[in-house]
Regions:
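Formylglycine-dependent sulfatase
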Residues: 1-273
């Protein structure tokens, strides 16, 4: 819908929109002008450029092998860093189109395999974390650095004041045998984690930056669901008339951002098949 309304649309990172060999496996068939490393898989075969991100040149690569980053194969670069570099290049190209841009930056981190980002690993070991938790922490910090790098890019190119930034996660943190500690404490003070209907599984972070509209250091405790982003982003972009094949379940939460108006009340539930 954004592409049809004049936006240059960029996907970077994890797609996982549809199964392999279906149209949904390819972000270019889902409305994006640019696809960087997105395909059917929801996790990478490897986060390491030295391991070709799981690709096996000359052999059959696993489904989770990350596509499209061949320039980094055999190099000492972590996936989160490579994606950030490519996202900035895509933004450079977007600025030459004289169109507004939409960047969907979806890191493969923080997802299994829990592999350490060596840029940050040693300091977490020095803090006394067990190796698996130290590795988990590096995935978080790598994503945090990526966000900071992209925000620096916006500042450097005088785009910050005219850019809306929405940061969120699709589920709670991992709570599984692949992590250290008891399952019910891994997202403390919330119970359980990803795949659970407890708060550790369904309560996610969200941060919004919109200079001149969203007041800094304000908080909102109203609950949202991921479907709410679709109508809200279109409202922010000024798209008023559009049709979709699917039923639209989301509610525009722009009133919460502007402080003008309220969200309608609704019941919420989670189904985990």
């Amino acid at each position: 819908v954004l592409k049809d309304n004049g936006y240059h649309t960029i996907h970077c990172g994890k797609a996982h929109f549809g199964a392999n060999d279906t149209p949904g496996a390819d972000p270019l068939k889902m409305g994006f002008d640019v696809n960087i490393a997105g395909h059917a898989a929801g996790s990478p075969a490897s986060y390491y450029g030295m391991q070709n991100f799981g690709n096996k040149p000359g052999g059959k690569s696993p489904l989770a092998a990350v596509p499209g980053l061949e320039k980094y194969h055999g190099k000492d670069v972590f996936l989160s860093e490579a994606l950030t570099i490519e996202a900035e290049k895509a933004l450079d190209n977007a600025r030459t189109t004289d169109k507004p841009f939409f960047l969907y930056m979806a890191h493969y981190a923080i997802h299994t395999p829990i592999q350490p980002d060596m840029r940050f690993y040693q300091k977490y070991l020095d803090k006394g974390l067990p190796p698996i938790e130290a590795a988990y922490a590096t995935l978080i910090e790598g994503m945090d650095k990526s966000l900071g790098d992209l925000m620096d890019y916006l500042d450097k190119n005088n785009l910050t004041d005219n850019t809306v930034l929405l940061f969120m996660s699709d589920n709670g943190g991992l709570a599984a045998h692949t992590r250290a500690g008891e399952l019910h404490t891994q997202n403390y003070p919330l119970n359980s984690g990803k795949g659970s209907a407890y708060e550790g599984g369904v309560r996610e972070p969200m941060i919004v930056s919109w200079p001149g509209v969203v007041a800094a250091e304000t908080k909102c405790d109203h609950y949202l669901m991921i479907e709410d982003f679709f109508p809200t982003i279109l409202e922010i972009a000024g798209v008023e008339h559009y049709n979709t094949v699917q039923k639209r379940d989301g509610i525009n939460f722009l009133p919460l951002l502007t402080g003008k108006g309220k969200m309608p009340a609704r019941d919420i539930y989670w189904h985990y098949p």
